[in-house]
Amino acid sequence: MAGPQQQPPYLHLAELTATQFLEIWKHFDADGNGYIEGKELENFFQELEKARKGSGMVSKSDNLGEKMKEFMQKYDKNSDGKIEMAELAQILPTEENFLLCFRQHVGSSTEFMEAWRKYDTDRSGYIEANELKGFLSDLLKKANRPYDEPKLQEYTQTILRMFDLNGDGKLGLSEMSRLLPVQENFLLKFQGMKLTSEEFNAIFTFYDKDGSGYIDENELDALLKDLYEKNKKEMNIQQLTSYRKSVMSLAEAEKLYRKDLEIVLCSEPPL
């Protein structure tokens, strides 16, 4: 049980700073899996109800179960019974609303990969703090949101604290992709079938018949189908087209190089 010193941040239904938003998220996502679910969701909802009553808001129903059902219908956009960070941003609007700014700019996986390509300039498989800062600066300009240097620094540090799961000061592609809504996050589809460097090199070499160091769109098509079949997973034509388009966003002149595909398919980004 939480003691008096461990009470959750008060859920004011007013504007929040990025730091306050993070405090609320970290408190309720106790297991750090990127969702609020189960008991976490129940605790979150109870605190939300307290905050609403504290601010004088009146609910239509006194039944907690009915309120939760109504709440989930409104905010659980992909109907998975969980609340993800981007969904929570709608419930608790932040002063800066940097998450929604981000999603507005990279609302699809294809746009996300194009943005990733632009800012992962050294092809390391990571966006580092200085690259992330430029990324966020561009997003804020695109959304016509005024900001100063200290505020931009706060956004950068907040995003790092949210998504830098191993604390190395960098954001990997899979970490950064958590900013996308689940239905747009094609990278999640490759979870559970990530390849070791040896496995990846073998499959890439198989499809790179001429040893050019890159594959084209048709070869990627075949590679993805092969990968799914080997892992006994189903994928329809629409999904295949979507995944291929997203991955090809990393290509140069329709050429997808080994290092770019390795970022997506390997369990660890290339060294």
Swiss-Prot record:
Keyword set, alphabetical order: Calcium, Cell projection, Metal-binding, Phosphoprotein, Repeat, Synapse
Residue numbers binding Ca(2+) 4: 164, 166, 168, 170, 175
Entry GO MF terms: calcium ion binding; calcium ion binding involved in regulation of presynaptic cytosolic calcium ion concentration
Highest taxon of source: Eukaryota
Record keyword Calcium present: yes
Domain EF-hand: 16-51, 63-98, 107-142, 151-186, 195-230, 235-270
Positions bound to Ca(2+) 5: 208, 210, 212, 214, 219
Binding site for Ca(2+) 3: 120, 122, 124, 126, 131
Family matches, as InterPro entries: CALB2, Calbindin_Ca-bind, EF-hand-dom_pair, EF_Hand_1_Ca_BS, EF_hand_dom
One GO biological process term: synaptic signaling
One GO CC term on file: terminal bouton
Binding site for Ca(2+) 1: 29, 31, 33, 35, 40
In-chain residues carrying the UniProt-annotated modification Phosphotyrosine: 214
One Pfam family, short name: EF-hand_1
Binding locations of Ca(2+) 2: 76, 78, 80, 82, 87
Compartments where found: Synapse; Cell projection, Dendrite
Function: Calcium-binding protein involved in calcium homeostasis and signal transduction. It plays a critical role in buffering intracellular calcium levels and modulating calcium-dependent signaling pathways. Predominantly expressed in specific neuronal populations, influences synaptic plasticity and neuronal excitability, contributing to learning and memory. During embryonic development, it facilitates neuronal differentiation and maturation.
Family listed: Belongs to the calbindin family.
Protein name (record): Calretinin
Source organism: Bos taurus (Bovine)
